Amino acid sequence: MDRMGAPSEPVWIDQESCRLEDFSRAVEVDTDAGDVPLADEIISKIPVYDGDRVRAVLDDAGAIRAYMAEWATVFRTGPGIVAFRRAFTELDVIDRVTEVLIGIIADEAESATGGGDHFAAAGANSRVWNAHEKLCVADPELFARYNANDLIPLVSRSWLGALFQVTTQVNVVRPGGKAQTCHRDYHMGFQTSQQLKDYPAHIHPVSAALTLQGAIAHCDMPLESGPTKL
């Protein structure tokens, strides 16, 4: 017990510290509509928001803070994910960005400069690393329009606070391509179990709190298309 009477937690953790029963119990928790009153609906335990409704209150600081507080709570103690319909209002921008990115993929494949996908054999899938910079160089005006989105900064600030930094990658998993292995996209998400043993327990959640991952669907993505599984 610590001074406050709470059970003491170990400083060092390893694989034996993790119990599958705890994980199963966590993922089986349902999402209560009362915990996400601003969501338009809940699908597969995921709160879904209407981008138009959020944009309608952009000038209302109190309403926006309420949305951000709800999202932060979802990330911290809820299902860990929020989804948006109509996050973008200019779908032609999405289509144009897609065309530019496809061109970048083709150019990098021809020149063998793309770097490839670290989950599959060379050439099986396609990656565009540092896609933001490459899009900006290829079409600065399109880059600006693509990033003139009100929702992405709000969601990012809800978890990371102000002055966050954005990095983007494109990942194309082709039919027959090897699926990604299970991982967490943050500083400690790709290290081996042996390496992770050198970090005290309190650093693990801190590292996760410093990163937020989002995805923008550029096309219809049914399950058959192999979207990222959460």
Regions found by a protein language model. Name each.
Residues M1-T77:
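Fe(II)/2-oxoglutarate
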Residues D2-W12, M68-P79, F88-L230:
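Non-heme Fe(II) oxygenase catalytic core, chiefly the N-lobe of the double-stranded beta-helix
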